[in-house]
Structures are given as C-alpha cells and as structure tokens.
C-alpha cells in the first residue's frame, strides 16, 4: 500500500515538472523571437541611414550579410510556415515585421501592420520603422 502511495506521489511530481518545463520552453522561444525582431529592426534602421532615408523595398535585404552578419534570424522552433512575417512598402517609406508568438495575448500587434491587422489579443509581436 505504501509503495502505491509513493509511486502516485512520484507520478504527480513528474507531471508537475514536465508541465513547468514546457511552459519555460515556450517563454524562452517567445523571448528569442522578440529579440530577433529587435535585430531585424536595428538592421533596417541601419539600412535606412545608409540608403538616403529609404527602407528596403523587399526581402532582398534579408540575405545581405552587411546587415545580418550572423545570417537572417530564424524561428527557434522548426515550423512548416514562416513565423516571421514581413510587410514592405514599395515607396520604401516604412516596414513592419512580425513574429508569431506561441503565447496568445503576449504580442503588441496593435501596431498598424497590414500583414497582421490590428490585433490586441493575438500573439504577434511586431517592429516597424522608427523614422
């Protein structure tokens, strides 16, 4: 009888540990996505300052090692669809780049980004032009 109680307690503790670990992993990946968005924003602002006040017109800048020496940031979790969604402006006056976070409601997509719309409860975290 005592052995069954001990086994049940161990099972409960293991279940709690696994759930806590999974939550920590999700938070860690979301933090990485937010940091990646800042890297992208900094690179685009550098592009702006070096190109007569124009932002990139398309995704070609993503492969430019001058702006992304370590390579363009990739989502920390392999996904069959892109987690990082760009929204370029053909007039080169603005940009918006968003990451789809795993934790809904933790984004800042109330920014006016046409690729995700105005969404205050979804999990998109966006950066946009600073100029």
List each model region and its residues.
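Active-site micro-motifs of SAM-dependent methyltransferase domains
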Residues: 11, 23-26, 46, 103
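Extracellular/periplasmic head regions of type IV pilus-like filament subunits
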Residues: 45-105
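Short, surface-exposed interaction loops/tails
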Residues: 91-131
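N-terminal single-pass transmembrane signal-anchor helix
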Residues: 1-21
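Membrane-proximal N-terminal amphipathic helix
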Residues: 26-52
